[in-house]
Regions:
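Midchain, well-structured core segments that form catalytic/ion-binding scaffolds
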Residues: 127-130, 136-149, 183-274
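N-terminal capping segment at the start of a domain
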Residues: 7-35, 140
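A non-catalytic alpha/beta surface segment that caps or lines the substrate-entry region
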Residues: 29-78, 82-84, 88, 99
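Flexible, glycine/charged-enriched surface loops at secondary-structure junctions
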Residues: 27-28, 56, 170-175, 258-273
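Active-site metal-coordination/substrate-binding segment of hydrolases
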Residues: 75-175, 180
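Buried hydrophobic packing segments
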Residues: 45, 157-165, 249-253
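Generic structural signal for well-ordered, non-membrane alpha-helical segments
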Residues: 3, 7-10, 34-42, 151, ...
Length: 274
């Protein structure tokens, strides 16, 4: 694969944004944003949008960053297009103190960094997409934290596009709505976005996938919380009386179709994920 030239503005923004901790907190999912730190990046982005000439750039009380870019001359009658990315990062690994660095990848295992003297690496077996990236410069964390490319890569791309439009008025484009939303990782995302004020006929979420891939449908899911209550009895006197809540859960899990799990499904096939 030929080395891809990266837009310096995208790279600079990405390296800067990932160093701002924005982890959402599932334990606080009853409030939006679930973590106050998401305002840190939200305020930075709103200010940068204002500097780039975006209209009505602001941060809502729920940490949504919203702004609009007028259509270029001659494109005023085109449908408004929305571009969306999310501020927060997942809780699956530490998100504060991210130290991004660039690794020139030559193939094989990708070593991001070290933890306790041991290399932190990703293999092509676990991440087949690496096979298409030999010869590329890849941004990695130092191995002690997540990187936050999901979705600060999308944030950086959208911001760089806004900057490019601001610098070159000859670029044709419809009216654009920009939104950076909180708490996507815990199931909220665009939940509290004012669609009418956003004012876009169509919108795309810039979040992951290989270069050139465009998806025109949305993933859809529903969530349920199931509570299992047992009866605690001393094991020596438990016959006919003890109810093990853990076993109830196992029985429940066994009722779900085994092959309808994420590891066995693809495409339009639905799945159950506990």
């Amino acid at each position: 694969m030929e080395n891809t030239t990266t837009n310096p503005d995208v790279l600079e923004r990405f390296l800067r944004y990932v160093q701002i901790n924005t982890q959402s907190e599932d334990a606080n999912c009853d409030q939006v944003p679930s973590s106050a730190v998401q305002f840190d990046l939200a305020n930075v982005l709103a200010e940068e949008l204002r500097e780039l000439g975006a209209e009505d750039a602001h941060v809502t009380e729920h940490a949504y960053v919203c702004a609009h870019i007028p259509a270029s001359a001659g494109a005023e009658d085109k449908p408004a297009l929305g571009l969306i990315a999310h501020l927060d990062t997942t809780e699956v690994a530490p998100g504060a103190g991210v130290k991004p660095h660039i690794v020139h990848y030559e193939g094989g295992g990708l070593v991001c960094g070290t933890v306790d003297g041991k290399p932190v690496a990703m293999s092509t077996a676990k991440l087949p997409a690496l096979n298409d990236l030999a010869g590329e410069d890849l941004v990695c964390s130092d191995g002690t934290t997540l990187l936050g490319a999901d979705d600060k890569a999308g944030v950086a791309e959208i911001m760089s596009l806004v900057a490019r439009i601001a610098q070159d008025s000859s670029l044709p484009h419809p009216a654009l709505g920009i939104c950076f939303c909180p708490d996507e990782e815990i199931g909220h995302g665009a939940e509290l976005l004012d669609i009418d004020t956003f004012g876009c006929k169509y919108a795309y979420t810039v979040d992951g996938g290989p270069i050139g891939e465009l998806e025109w449908e949305c993933f859809n899911a529903a969530e349920a919380t199931v509570r299992f209550e047992g009866q605690s009895i001393h094991p020596g006197d438990a016959k006919g009386r003890m109810v093990n809540a853990g076993n109830l859960f196992c029985d429940f899990n066994a009722l779900l179709p085994y092959v309808q799990r994420p590891e066995y499904t693809e495409g339009y096939e639905g799945f159950y994920h506990l």
